[in-house]
Amino acid sequence: LDGTAYSSASPVYYAGTDQDEEAQTSSTAVNLGDQLQIRLDAQGHPSKVVIDPELMWPVANLGAGGFTVNGVAVRVNSNAATGPVTYYTGLNDFSSRQDGMQVEVHGAYGQSADGKGYIQATRIEQLPASNPVTRLTGVVSNLNAANGSFQIGATVVQTQASTLITPSG
């Protein structure tokens, strides 16, 4: 991973489901382009690997170089010379996506020259149309601690006492 070799046999693997944030899975669940969180033990060996998408929700605002998910811009790329290539699961390519299609987006957070955040997609997976899970990643803006709200991209999030924000802090 990023130039460091790790044994894939030692850690326990987890992935989100439509019922749980993290459910145990096998190492074969890791796909090319997936974003991973790797937790190391005291000896520097992986003990836990979490397959961790950046966004989950329907596609909106399809354009030539991307789309939005939950108000967060997603950029796609097919040219290895200009950055990470976007891979697709359950889709043939960029043109097979449609507004309203449920997707899971893996990638890296970036900022444009004008300071707007986006996800540079490394993998996009089509999800079932009835997917109940929403996942949102980005920079928090318009934080209002008094009423428990904040904004990521164009999405306003209203928290409650039972809201879990990870990572905490």
Regions found by a protein language model. Give the residues of each.
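Short, flexible, surface-exposed loop segments at domain boundaries
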Residues: 1-169
